[in-house]
Each structure stands twice: as C-alpha cells, then as structure tokens.
Amino acid sequence: MHRYRSHTCGELRASDVGSDVRLSGWLHNRRDLGGILFIDLRDHYGITQLVARPGTPAYEALDKVSKESTVRVDGKVVSRGTENVNPDLPTGEIEVEVSEVELLGAAAPLPFTINAEDGVNEERRLEYRFLDLRRERMHRNILLRTAVISAIRHKMTALGFNEMATPILSATSPEGARDFVVPSRLHPGKFYALPQAPQQFKQLLMISGFDRYFQIAPCFRDEDARADRSPGEFYQLDVEMSFVEQEDVFQPIEKLMTELFEEFGGGRHVTSPFPRIPFREAMLKYGSDKPDLRAQLELVDITDIFEGSEFKAFAGKHVRALPVPDVSGQTRKFFDGLGDYAVEQGAKGLAWVRVGEDGSLTGPIAKFLTEENVAELTKRLSLAPGHAVFFGAGEFDEVSKIMGAVRVEAAKRSGNFEENVFRFCWIVDFPMYEKDEDTGKIDFSHNPFSMPQGGLEALETQDPLDILGWQYDIVCNGVELSSGAIRNHEPEIMLKAFEIAGYDRDTVEEQFAGMLRAFRFGAPPHGGIAPGVDRIVMLLADEPNIRETIAFPLNGNAQDLMMGAPTELDETRLRELHLSVRKPQPK
C-alpha cells in the first residue's frame, strides 16, 4: 500500500464497503456522540467521515489531534446505513472505521475557524492565506481560475492563435499608470520596468510577421486597489491580430466569451450576439460606458423639453429622465428610498412624478410642469397609468454618473432586473479627443495609440472633438473586462494625432522611438484586446471582490501580509544596486 494513501477523501463509495484503505488529509471537524468519535477528514478532493470507537488506540490518538492537523489513517470502509446517509457528500454512504493513526503535521491554535465562511477580517485572512485557501469557497475559486485559464488556452489555440511569451524586464513606459521599476546592478543608475502590459511587444510581434498572438500575461501597475482591480499584479488574456478591422477582433473574442461563460457560469445564460453600443449612446441611455444591461430600464435625454423653462431646477441644464413601468403598488417608501440612494451617489435630490389612472402627473415637481411639458413627456417616454418618472439635472458627466447608478438601483427595487444571466456588450465609437474645461486644452480621451476613424484626412479636416477612434470596450454585467483598439500603425498619422493633443514631433519621436522605428519598416494594420482574467473569474465565481479569486493577492495597501512584502534592503544590497534611500519627511 502507498505510504500515504490508497484513495483520496472524495473517492470512496458504497461499492468500496469491506475494503481496507489508507487516507491522508486535514482534520476538518470532530464530533463526540455517545463516546464514539466522528472525524471529517478533508483533502483536495473531498471529505470522508472517520469513526473511532472508545478504548481503541485510534480513538486515543485522534482524540488528541487538533483541528487542521494532517494525519494518515488506516481502516475499513463500512456502510453508514440508509438512515445515516449524508446526501450532501459524494462519500456520504460510507465511513471508515479507523484502526491506525499517524500524525503527519500538528496544527497550532488557529487564528480563525476554517469551516466558517464569513465574519473573518480580510487582513487576518491574507496574513494566513495558506489557511484561508483551505476553505471550501476559496479552494473552489482557485480551482475555477485554473480551469478557466486552461480552457482559454485550449479555445484560443483552436481559434488559430499562437501563444507567445514577451519580456518581463523592459523599459519604463511614459504613458499609463506608474511603473514598478527594477534597478540594474550592471548598469548603475539605470532601471528596468515590469510591464504594465505587453502592449508594445505584441504589436512588434505583428510587425515581425506573426498573425494571431495570445498570452496569459502578467501585468504590473503601481496603482491603488478597487473591488475589481488588484494592486500590483494582475493577469490578462493578451490578444493581437494582423490585417484586421474592428469586427475581425470581435468575432473570436465573442465566441470565446460565450463558450467560456456558458461552460463555467453555473447555469447562467449568456445573451448573444453582443450588442454594439456607441459610447455617446451608452452615456445617454445608461449613464455609463460600462452599462449593466441586466437592468431593463433606460434613461432618456429630455434636455430639449426644458430649454427656456422657468423651472429653475432644470433650466439651462442637461436633463435625463428614467421612466419606470408599473409602480402602482409601490409606496412612498420606494420613492424616498431611491431619493436617498441618489443623494449617496452625489445628487442634491431626486425629482419624480407618477402617472395616475387618468393620465395626470402627481408628485413633488408635478406643479412645475406645463401642459406642454406633460404632453411631450407622455409622448417621448410612452407614459401610461401606473408609471413613474425620475429626473436628474446637471452637467452632462455628473448627471450621467448619478442617473446611471439610479437606473440600476431602480431596476433592482422595481423588479426590472434580470438574474442568472450574463449580458455582454461592446462599447464602440469612443471620442478620440476631449477638452479640459479649465484649461481649454485638447487631449486624448482614451487610447492615444488607436487609429482615428477617417485616418489622416479626419485629423486634418475635422474638429478634433468630432473625431472618433477605432477603440472599443467589452463589458459584462456592468464590469469592463477589457479595452482594445485598432492600432495606429502609420507614423505620419500617429505624429499628427499627437500634434493635435499638444505634443511636438521631437518629443513623440524620442518617447516612442522603438515603435516608430518599427512602424517605418512595413507595419501591417493590426488590432487587439486584453480581457482581464481576474475579472472574468470574479464574474464566474460571483464574487464581489477580485482578491477572492487570486491565490496570493496583495491587500488594499499593496502589501503582502503573509510574506511581509515590501521589505527594506540592507546597506550591502543597496550598495550592490548603487542605490541610496531617501524617505519622505514626516509632516
């Protein structure tokens, strides 16, 4: 028999009754019932119940073993009997009567209970992550991540993509987030940077003659944490394709996402094809360029209805309406609750009216609406008895953000929100440029390296604020999974695009010398995308925080509490790297 086990803890069934077996695992739980000791033994594969009778060496040994210790046990498989079957366990028809016990690794007193899923401080969990990962939910999440990455590789290869590795040590990048830098011992005073993304390298692969590239790429950004973003390190499915237009990128990614989310989504349906929504339309209808399409309500721009209005709350402002059908059964609490929610999002309040059986409008602002206002609102919003309308007014970006959040919350509270579904969309036609309202300066609004729609002619003849870029986002249930673009591969178009944003030619030539040099040697049209693996797994696992899907994440302050990183270097190491440390003075 094997030194540690003949079977796993998830393997034994009724057909194994009478067999002599050896198991190894962690002592998950213990119960003493009428002097008989019942032990749940857990390993990677499952749980098997052990039984130790009083007066036996096995009982004496197991009675002294602390929870989460590792043990090896020998014993005989016996039936639990029909009345004692545990239907929640695959091994629930049997138990193992233990005859011999070997303690493999004793566990110290636990900092928290392993088999209690909630109520444990996250900082403590991260400090003892090796214990936290023993919990069923966390173990399941990490295995899901493994399976998803394996499936991505298989599916991308089947779609004709080739997996290639790009450098981890590279040059610092002048755009994007802050770099993590690595000092060079051999080149005093010089530094490498960990890649924020393999962006330039994957484009260089296309220029090198490769056609369809992908990589499960580690990316490093010195930025703050969010619920959907891990500080420090994250992984993305990095993709680039040659001789493509926008739809050519969409097709394989849409197929991949549909198959991936159907396979691992736990029965939640994927709606396809994914709609293409222009950026401006998304902001007007949903108040966000990351719309949650499970919310079956849409905003309506009614600014024109109130142009020149004497109602000061709306006059001269951007006004958005949110019609909500069939709220006849809702009390004042529903309306006040949404008003409170809007205030939490930054609004001063939330105006509303409701439609009576006779079609008349009642509510806090009804008296300020003229007959013409009411007639136009009824027509524009297709109002009917039992409907309600919520209003937001202000600057475009402000009212979009607030009413976008209210749209989703109102859908949830009014029964207009789809559950158990993944609703994807593509956001397209992003503006190439935006104007800083304070300085009047024109700058890039999103990706400076995307190809402008209309090419050089558009840059030379159109108002910069009217130019759109070949840029796109893929969004699922209100979570942005990735941005992407058709790249600007022509040096003269790139230089002109940067000139409009206020960059002189020499600066661009210096900062992007490597890419511009490559572009001048026959670069193909190319484009790509890079969906975040961590965010994909977060959605599939239905977790609210991305750290729940990463084996060893940093905390919100970019610290590894388990390993004690970041650490200080001693003087010897600093001298080797030609560094000295200058800490900020306390304020």
UniProtKB/Swiss-Prot annotation:
Positions binding ATP in this chain are R221, D222, E223, E480, G532, V533, D534, R535
Describe its function. Catalyzes the attachment of L-aspartate to tRNA(Asp) in a two-step reaction: L-aspartate is first activated by ATP to form Asp-AMP and then transferred to the acceptor end of tRNA(Asp).
Q: What is the protein's name according to its record? A: Aspartate--tRNA ligase
In the UniProt record, what gene is named as encoding this protein?
Answer: aspS
Self-association state and partner proteins as the record states? Homodimer.
Cite the binding residues for L-aspartate. Answer: E175, R221, H446, R487
Q: Which Pfam families match?
A: GAD (PF02938), tRNA-synt_2 (PF00152), tRNA_anti-codon (PF01336)
| Chief subcellular location | cytoplasm
Q: Where in the cell is it found?
A: Cytoplasm
What are the record keywords, sorted?
A: Aminoacyl-tRNA synthetase, ATP-binding, Cytoplasm, Ligase, Nucleotide-binding, Protein biosynthesis
Q: Where does the record place the region Aspartate? A: 199-202
EC number(s) on record? 6.1.1.12
Question: Which superkingdom?
Answer: Bacteria
Top-rank EC class of the record's enzyme: ligase
- What is the catalytic activity of this protein? tRNA(Asp) + L-aspartate + ATP = L-aspartyl-tRNA(Asp) + AMP + diphosphate
The UniProt entry's sequence similarity note says: Belongs to the class-II aminoacyl-tRNA synthetase family. Type 1 subfamily.
Q: Which Gene3D superfamilies match?
A: Bira Bifunctional Protein, Domain 2 (3.30.930.10), GAD-like domain (3.30.1360.30), Nucleic acid-binding proteins (2.40.50.140)
The opening ranks of the lineage are: Bacteria, Bacillati, Actinomycetota, Actinomycetes, Kitasatosporales
